[in-house]
């Protein structure tokens, strides 16, 4: 992480109202292994994002005095295996975060492209954190199969969010995403989160709502198994406890989809743990999802993963992991490999 002072805020400038700084930071992650999704063929790959999707970012803050400050964040994903930006073809340049904000003693407000509170809770309360290659909780939340999984991305465009101060370990966040067009009056998303942390215990409660874009049923194109999807609501409860010899995570999620001719409801649970050693951690995680309702096909999915993460230094680690992923009616998915991650 590299910090530097903006040219106009040197200590010798008598007219400077407040100190400002900009920080450059990021993570590079490369992975070599075998990847097979349920129902798909096996591919031997060298790619990015085994444990963390690679990204770089710039953040800045200006102290305005009396407990107030302004800030900004710009973050861009990249693929270290081929040098392209984004997570996939067509992804935006600053697709991780892009916002400005104001912090005060009464909380903070941000506006722009924002990471959702649901995503932050999902990666905070599972042993494999934000791994889009190995984390079962990520897969059951954001990489659903059939009628399962959350609609949309882990970031929302045209969004505004408020985060409260922390009182006794408790704080809250509310987020709203605008349709930004007079021709799509139905387009909006919103979510709320309550978080609590006290010593070794932490917990989070999330609710997220996504409405149709312009006419009822048009977001169904996002999920082929749910034609005519009109709206979706997601409730997620997570908790963790650090026993020092092992950190345990648990989560429950309900996703309820309203479609033109019926409903689909998916209940998901996960349990995972991380066993720390002096320079390493053993990771294990299990997630299960079961769908019901007239449009659900009673789909079921079971995913588990184990991994070993070894620290070379405070910034760099090596890892190896294996994931088993079974979705009803499809051949089992198996993914395994080794990787390296470094922070700057």
PLM region spans:
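Transmembrane beta-strands of outer-membrane beta-barrel pores
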Residues: 30-36, 76-80, 115-117, 176-180, ...
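Outer-membrane beta-barrel "beta-signal"
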Residues: 332-344
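Solvent-exposed loop/turn segments connecting transmembrane beta-strands
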Residues: 151-157, 178-187, 259-265, 293-300, ...
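Detector for outer-membrane/organellar transmembrane beta-barrel domains
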Residues: 191-305
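Cleavable N-terminal export/targeting peptides
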Residues: 1-21
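Repeated loop/turn-to-beta-strand initiation elements of outer-membrane beta-barrel proteins
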Residues: 68-70, 106-109, 169-172, 200-205, ...
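Outer-membrane beta-barrel architecture
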Residues: 57-59, 99-101, 161-163, 193-195, ...
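Outer membrane beta-barrel
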Residues: 19-33, 43-178, 186-188, 195-202
């Amino acid at each position: 992480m590299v910090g530097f002072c903006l040219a106009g805020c040197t200590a010798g400038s008598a007219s400077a109202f407040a100190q400002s700084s900009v920080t450059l930071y990021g993570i590079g992650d490369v992975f070599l292994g075998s990847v097979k999704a349920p129902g798909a063929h096996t591919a031997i790959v060298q790619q990015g994002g085994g444990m963390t999707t690679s990204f770089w970012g710039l953040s800045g803050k200006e102290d305005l005095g009396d407990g107030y400050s302004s800030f900004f964040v710009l973050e861009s994903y990249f693929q270290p295996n081929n040098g392209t930006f984004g997570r996939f073809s067509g992804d935006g340049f600053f697709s991780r975060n892009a916002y400005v904000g104001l912090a005060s003693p009464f909380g903070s407000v941000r506006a722009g492209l924002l990471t959702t509170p649901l995503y932050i809770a999902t990666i905070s309360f599972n042993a494999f954190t934000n791994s889009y290659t190995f984390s079962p909780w990520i897969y059951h939340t954001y990489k659903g199969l059939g009628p399962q999984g959350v609609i949309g991305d882990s970031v929302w465009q045209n969004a505004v969010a408020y985060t409260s101060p922390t009182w006794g370990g408790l704080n809250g966040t509310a987020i709203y995403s605008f349709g930004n067009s007079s021709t799509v009056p139905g387009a909006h998303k919103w979510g709320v989160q309550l978080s609590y942390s006290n010593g070794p215990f932490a917990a989070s409660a999330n609710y997220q709502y996504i409405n149709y874009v312009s006419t009822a049923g048009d977001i169904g194109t996002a999920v082929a198994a749910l034609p005519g999807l009109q709206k979706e609501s997601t409730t997620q409860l997570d908790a963790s406890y650090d026993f020092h010899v092992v950190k345990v995570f648990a989560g429950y999620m309900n996703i309820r989809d309203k479609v033109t001719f019926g409903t689909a409801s998916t209940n998901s649970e996960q349990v995972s743990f991380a066993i720390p050693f002096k320079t390493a951690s053993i990771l294990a995680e299990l997630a299960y999802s079961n769908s019901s309702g007239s449009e659900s096909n009673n789909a079921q999915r079971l995913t588990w993963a184990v991994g070993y993460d070894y620290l070379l230094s405070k910034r760099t680690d090596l890892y190896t992991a294996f994931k088993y992923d079974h979705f009803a009616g499809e051949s089992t998915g198996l993914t395994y490999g080794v990787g390296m991650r470094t922070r700057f």
